[in-house]
């Protein structure tokens, strides 16, 4: 298997060099055509997706991530059209100067080359990644999870068909075999893959970071907090907490821990009351338990263990932590945060400013839901993931983050003195 994969990676590198010659207009035409063709291939994609769904335990919270339906395919097509409508990130002059010796220097944005993505049960990522990589002039190597194998195969078949219709080398997109051995080859593919982005659980991200010889950008895992301050607006907090927890509980920007000022414990039952309608399980500290006992459904209320405050639930579960003041809230968040998205509900401007300055995360919110951590919501188009590291990219990784740069230098015979 290794030799076959390496040969295919040779082909991908060759295709990436061809992409440099494509105009933005040609790329946009292909992306729009792909979006238009999704409805025509909807039946095949959904049938393949159903095969994947049937292989997964229905109680697994990953089912929602795996699921495709007509509405989600329409949303995917809309995201692809949006990517096509965005300005190209390539050939932008980032910096320019003329040296005293007359040399003209320009720093311009260019493709990374070949970008590898390792991801779990998220077949929509296959579309998103291809659109972003093509728009930014990059070839793509995908290693999807075995849970989404049939869905990914059907999607890649459609993309390859559209590439061929537009006269573009289909090796621009390569879907690795589902076997584990393929991931090991990918992680060691120095000289073939320029950057690898893992999308999925913390376990997956840790594995890729610890085992890859190719540069890695960490994305994904979100242990997300919302702090309800002593000055927090009750109605605003109620709707924000409900949205952040229940809109799509299986995604990385969903709320995991509500941190509440002890002087507002009397309002806790009101803040979490709407969560009952979605059967949200609460894992709460002693102070919160005393407040909620007898109000929140007994079957859904549990006393928290230490591990509940460091868990990305990805389901209808949430922990609650009581703190004495802002400093204690900040300390709790610093201890358990994955540096993804954090929020405060407060009306005191000084408190908000302190929180937003001191919290170390890719995205920090005041008085709104963490569900907005998303490339499309930021006006960036679809994103490859949410980077939780600080080098190269942080937050939603969209088109600009899919490029690097090079220096172009023009002279008229200058030589450097000895």
Swiss-Prot record:
GO biological process: L-proline biosynthetic process
Pathway: Amino-acid biosynthesis; L-proline biosynthesis; L-glutamate 5-semialdehyde from L-glutamate: step 2/2
E.C. code: 1.2.1.41
SUPFAM superfamilies for the chain: ALDH-like (SSF53720)
CDD domains cross-referenced by the UniProt entry: ALDH_F18-19_ProA-GPR
Catalytically driven reaction(s): L-glutamate 5-semialdehyde + phosphate + NADP(+) = L-glutamyl 5-phosphate + NADPH + H(+)
Listed GO CC annotations: cytoplasm
InterPro entries, per database record: Ald_DH/histidinol_DH, Ald_DH_C, Ald_DH_N, G-glutamylP_reductase_CS, Glu-5-SA_DH, GPR_dom
GO molecular function: glutamate-5-semialdehyde dehydrogenase activity; NADP binding
Localization per record: Cytoplasm
Gene3D superfamilies for the chain: Aldehyde Dehydrogenase, Chain A, domain 1 (3.40.605.10), Aldehyde Dehydrogenase, Chain A, domain 2 (3.40.309.10)
Signal sequence residues: none
Keyword Flavoprotein: no
Role this protein plays: Catalyzes the NADPH-dependent reduction of L-glutamate 5-phosphate into L-glutamate 5-semialdehyde and phosphate. The product spontaneously undergoes cyclization to form 1-pyrroline-5-carboxylate.
Family indicated by similarity: Belongs to the gamma-glutamyl phosphate reductase family.
HAMAP family linked: ProA
Full protein name: Gamma-glutamyl phosphate reductase
Organism: Chlorobium chlorochromatii (strain CaD3)
Lineage: Bacteria, Pseudomonadati, Chlorobiota, Chlorobiia, Chlorobiales
